[in-house]
Amino acid sequence: NSCQSLYLGCLLSLNREKDFNEKYKELADKKACNSDIGGIVEHANIIYGKKYTSTFCHESINYVFIEKINEELFSENDLKELISYSKMSKKEDRSQGLLENGIQTSGNLFSLDYPFIKSIQKALEIKIEKYKKKFPNSGQGFINNWPKNYELSAWMISMKTGGFLKSHNHEYGWITGSFYLQIPKYKNNDDSGNIAFSYQGPRYPNKGKNFNLTIKKIETRDICIFPSSLFHHTIPFNSSEERI
């Protein structure tokens, strides 16, 4: 399945529309379903002016969910401990090509045995279940083929002023989520520090087409969940505070 979607992505990168069309039909007939296919198909729809239906998630921008994780689910003390851990662990950060003026923790946070990590994991699992139940009759592949067993992976990203994440999607994931521990208050009420979504894959040709950008406002304690096929980036910000 992943090899086939990789091949589909290569055909899109090479702008071989006829071959792409044939491969898409073959994968659609097989009901191949992964986030890589989802991202590829939505980009292709724009540049080829087609209406391919994504077997993973069609019109994935409609499946962005933002909600607060309140203190009942994740205490203020645990949140502060998580921020402290992020500041202490900076010596173990890994390089991240998509990240400008920021740092990312290495490894999977959920492999750590701290009470505040267990607490945020439990809160996230509750929100993930709520997300799944929000779209019961959507007919979308990623809901209908929801994995019976899944593993959560998490890392922390801290950005300083001017920092941002470049556009990407998570082609090996199922759903993607961001939980915001600290979002600075910005002087001007613009889109600084917000998250932006698009069907434009940065590795694929755009053929001069216009890709709509959808920007969602995020605040401290918000969780934003969306299909892993959806390309996203963040808007640079200007603040003396870190964005975590």
Specify the residue positions occupied by each region the protein language model found.
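Non-heme Fe(II)/2-oxoglutarate
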Residues: 53-143
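Catalytic core of non-heme Fe(II) oxygenases with the double-stranded beta-helix
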Residues: 115-125, 129-225, 233-236, 241-244
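Residue-level recognition of well-ordered secondary-structure positions
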Residues: 21, 38, 80-83, 125, ...
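Alpha-helical protein-protein interaction scaffolds
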Residues: 1-50
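Conserved catalytic-core motifs of GNAT/GCN5-like acyltransferases
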Residues: 230
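Generic structural signal for short, solvent-exposed loop/turn connectors between secondary structure elements
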Residues: 2-4, 26-31, 75-79, 88-91, ...
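Glycine-centered flexibility motif
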Residues: 49, 97-106, 191-198
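Short, exposed beta-strand "edge-strand" segments with a Pro/Gly-rich flavor and a Y/T-containing core
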Residues: 64-70, 219-226
